A protein has these predicted regions:
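Bacterial N-terminal signal peptides
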Residues: 2-11
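Extended soluble regions of mature proteins
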Residues: 16-280
């Protein structure tokens, strides 16, 4: 049986930017940031369980808005658009460290809603939905995270069961990703299969820091819905070559036996299931 290595079409460092990189200068301030919480997000690359990756992510609490995004993606954007010579923006990354281009905004662009920007291939998709309702079951179980006493809570949300640890010591009803609705800041969360784990690493009180959003005047953004985006994300494993063709790109694989690269046609390749936090 011939083995293949999938080569996704990321442009080379010296001539081009990461496929989802966003120019920092094209962002606009929308709020003042009061708190920044840095999380490490560990996730399974696929359900074979052989590879676990991680991203460094940030939750910014503003006066009226909340922003959750990849710190690694922001770092790559800054390096790529400031570099005057050839540079590898991931040089300081660990072997299993990645950057996930997804930005989640609370109360933006409208109050009582969340706006989500997701990078897929070479396009930013945007959708808006009402603030998700999470029904939590609280317990008396406790643990200590970053010196804060945290309580355990559990919920079922969009097809998956999650456990979260929150601290009433910081009365902010938010957390990583879309988690919300608990009487305190969520410092750790995981799903029942341990496919996804978020854990806080640092909490900072901010001064003179802004919350930014991409300026649609300077960025290619396609408006969609959450369910339509989920269907597109499914193609990452059901038909990845078709997904790239759909976005005006291409996918090649290398034959481990011959070393030759081959262009894949839509429907020609299926990958192990790539989990997503939302199933429905």
């Amino acid at each position: 049986l011939t083995l293949f290595i999938v080569l996704f079409c990321h442009p080379c460092y010296c001539q081009s930017r990461s496929v989802n990189a966003r120019k920092p200068q094209d962002q606009i301030p929308i709020d003042s940031c009061l708190y920044s919480i840095t999380y490490t997000y560990h996730y399974a690359n696929d359900t074979t369980g052989k590879v676990r990756l991680f991203d460094k992510q940030v939750l910014e609490i503003g006066t009226t808005t909340v922003h959750y995004y990849s710190k690694n993606a922001a770092l790559i954007d800054s390096i790529m658009f400031q570099a005057k010579v050839a540079v590898n923006p991931r040089k300081s990354f660990a072997a299993n460290e990645r950057e996930l281009y997804e930005d989640i905004y609370w109360n933006y662009p409208h109050k009582d809603s969340i706006g989500v920007y997701t990078g897929l291939v070479n396009v930013d998709y945007f959708y808006e939905e009402p603030v998700p309702s999470m029904e939590w079951k609280l317990t008396e179980d406790t643990c200590s995270i970053l010196g804060y006493t945290c309580f355990r809570a559990s919920t079922r949300f969009r097809g998956r069961s999650y456990t979260a640890w929150f601290t009433p010591g910081i009365p902010i009803s938010h957390g990583p990703w879309k988690f919300n609705g608990l009487p305190g800041l969520i410092l750790k969360a995981r799903d029942e299969a341990d496919l996804f784990v978020w854990e806080a690493q640092n909490i900072s009180r901010e001064q003179n820091k802004k919350v930014y959003v991409m300026n649609p005047r300077f960025n290619k953004i396609i408006e969609t819905t959450r369910t339509k985006l989920l269907r597109l994300q499914e193609k990452r494993w059901k038909d990845p070559a078709g997904l790239y063709v759909q976005h005006g790109s291409a996918m090649h694989v290398r034959d481990n036996k011959t070393g030759k690269f081959m262009k894949m046609a839509p429907g020609q390749l299926v990958l192990p299931y790539i989990p997503v936090p939302e199933l429905e």
